[in-house]
Amino acid sequence: MYKSNIFRPTFIALNVAVMCAGTQASMVRNDVDYQYFRDFAENKGQFFIGAKNIPIFDKQGKSVGTMLPNLPMPDLHVASRVSGVATLFNPQYIASVKHNGGYGSVQFGENSNNPDSHHFDYLITDRNNHDKYDFHSPRLHKLVTEVTPIPLNNIAFDNNRKTGPKNGAFLDKERYPYFVRVGSGRQYLRSKDGKEKTSLTSAYNYLTGGTPLKPNSSMDNWVLFSGDLYETLGTYGLPGDSGSPLLAYDAKEQRWVLAGVLSTFNGYDGKNNIYTIIQPDSIHRAFENDEMTVSLNGSTYSWQNQGVGKSILQSSNQAVEIPVTNVNVASKD
């Protein structure tokens, strides 16, 4: 069992019981077709990239709401395939929570289990754990080519501290009108009164997605979502959804951004999820530590063909002879 210390002990925080165990899960409503949540997570059916104003109906055909009102459906393939525990924000970097210490590689692309499908394992070479918060930005051993990275939320640079967004930043509906999430693991259905919970499958078999309840409290390093699971395609993240992405639509930049990664919940009967907000300071330090600077000291090099089967590579203090083809000699072939 994991006890989080990613936030200051406010009244709200102290009343959120935090548990993060090894089994993954996601809780959704039981009165709509479950396929909605699966298709959403994989951009299938009516949830294709760029789709807007998607109507949702319950099992009796009654409308329960509209997903993505006048907003484009994001590409959710940025989450690691099948598990969804990490998100690609750079061709060689992913974001997740540092208490996810058990995974050493990720895959990206379609979630098909077709044996003819080939998926590459991108190995983690450096975990880049944040020294204070439940966040890390691991580096991968190769550049990911299957998907395009999602931009990072940059609201952290909209204030003087430069370390995190101002308090209440994600409660600004003008800037952030909509959030979505995706995750994997043991899947549950829950009735509206909360009395009936149905387990569907064990962990890591497929992804589900939808909206992450509603933002309730927002600080400089975490944001709390809570509310009614029966808000259209509401989803409540459970322990093993740790590290799964929180995507926000940034109305100022007119695009979807990675806002945070799921860190905590407050029980199978609860309704509170806390996400660690993306930490740009930690990411920039990781970039600086991983990058190598090569200095040529302003030297000048010249390479001259001598015309007799050799050439000279000349610097200010050294000359190297390099054999080349002598075009004046006829070929023996």
Name the predicted role of every residue range:
Residues 91-93, 103, 130-137, 174-176, ...:
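Extracellular structured ligand-interaction cores
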Residues 26-60, 77, 84-100, 199-333:
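C-terminal subregion of chymotrypsin/trypsin-like serine protease catalytic domains
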Residues 90-91, 95-133, 143-146:
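Catalytic-histidine neighborhood of serine endopeptidases
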Residues 102-116, 168-170, 177-182, 248:
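Short conserved beta-strand and strand-loop elements enriched in small hydrophobics
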